[in-house]
Amino acid sequence: MHSSVYFVALVILGAAVCAAQPRGRILGGQEAAAHARPYMASVQVNGTHVCGGTLLDEQWVLSAAHCMDGVTDDDSVQVLLGAHSLSAPEPYKRWYDVQSVVPHPGSRPDSLEDDLILFKLSQNASLGPHVRPLPLQYEDKEVEPGTLCDVAGWGVVTHAGRRPDVLHQLRVSIMNRTTCNLRTYHDGVVTINMMCAESNRRDTCRGDSGSPLVCGDAVEGVVTWGSRVCGNGKKPGVYTRVSSYRMWIENITNGNMTS
């Protein structure tokens, strides 16, 4: 489904970046109440969960661009909505084929910037109490440091790499970007288009990439990268700020696929 072709040198460089700044890293959280987060999506490749996502409306899901690294036209990409458990039968869960995959034009495997992707479902999602969109934060203002925000996903929940079958959630505290960029943390690589959250033994982990960071009633960020070791307090979790990409998201979801 992901048709972009990268030069070999770019792929090698991208691998080096990811080794230093691993992608998608819920550790230290707890199981979410079933269907309490009806906006959550599971992005799946060939039937396997790879990333989280946010349902924006009946046809569009927002996630992280790096989730499609290595995915080809021969792979099957689907989005699961209405799920708490990835495997157990549930009355409201349904898989949707993906009609279009639209990565941000600035996203590249050798870069941490512009790490967003939009999936257009092949048919409208059936909305209700268990499947419901969540609004994005479009006001371009910083979230105050110390603000408590929620993140959820089906990613790794232990250092041993155990992946849960049910949705887990975590509350994190927003960190000042200047602090996050200190040499002892991320050493200047966090840009104005990113935001940080404290990660001391409580963090997103592998498989949580693309999941929304929810502050109040809006999506403020998308899980993108962090530490090689999830929950490392010296490597805060980093999220892509959605307000920085308002125009791109609106253009694509309103039908301007060339944006």
UniProtKB/Swiss-Prot annotation:
Which cysteines share a disulfide bond? C51-C67, C149-C215, C180-C196, C205-C230
Instruction: State a single Pfam family of this protein.
Output: Trypsin
Q: Which residues form the Peptidase S1 domain?
A: 26-254
The reaction(s) annotated as catalysed by this protein in its Swiss-Prot or TrEMBL entry are: Selective cleavage of Arg-|-Lys bond in complement factor B when in complex with complement subcomponent C3b or with cobra venom factor
What post-translational changes are documented for it? CFD is activated by the removal of 5 residues at the N-terminus, named activation peptide, by the MASP-3 isoform of MASP1.
Residue ranges annotated as propeptide in the record: 21-25
SUPFAM superfamilies reported for this sequence: Trypsin-like serine proteases (SSF50494)
- Judging by the UniProt lineage, the source's domain of life is Eukaryota
Write out the annotated subcellular location. Answer: Secreted
- One Gene Ontology CC term in the entry: extracellular space
Name a single GO biological process: response to bacterium
Major enzyme class: hydrolase
Which InterPro entries did the record assign?
Peptidase_S1_PA, Peptidase_S1_PA_chymotrypsin, Peptidase_S1A, Trypsin_dom, TRYPSIN_HIS, TRYPSIN_SER
Any GO MF annotation of the entry: serine-type endopeptidase activity
Q: Where is this site: Cleavage?
A: R25, I26
Give the EC number(s) under which this enzyme is classified: 3.4.21.46
Keywords assigned by UniProt, alphabetized: Complement alternate pathway, Disulfide bond, Glycoprotein, Hydrolase, Immunity, Innate immunity, Protease, Secreted, Serine protease, Signal, Zymogen
Q: What is its main location?
A: secreted
Record's keyword annotation contains Protein transport: no
| Positions of the catalytic residues | H66, D115, S209
Sugar-bearing residue positions: N46, N124, N176, N251, N256
Q: How is its activity regulated?
A: Circulates in plasma in a mature but self-inhibited form. Activated by factor B (CFB), which displaces the self-inhibition loop. Associates with CFB complexed with complement C3b.
Q: What does this protein do?
A: Serine protease that initiates the alternative pathway of the complement system, a cascade of proteins that leads to phagocytosis and breakdown of pathogens and signaling that strengthens the adaptive immune system. In contrast to other complement pathways (classical, lectin and GZMK) that are directly activated by pathogens or antigen-antibody complexes, the alternative complement pathway is initiated by the spontaneous hydrolysis of complement C3.
What family, per the record? Answer: Belongs to the peptidase S1 family.
Q: What is this protein called?
A: Complement factor D
Q: Native species of this protein? A: Mus musculus
Q: What is the lineage of its organism?
A: Eukaryota, Metazoa, Chordata, Craniata, Vertebrata
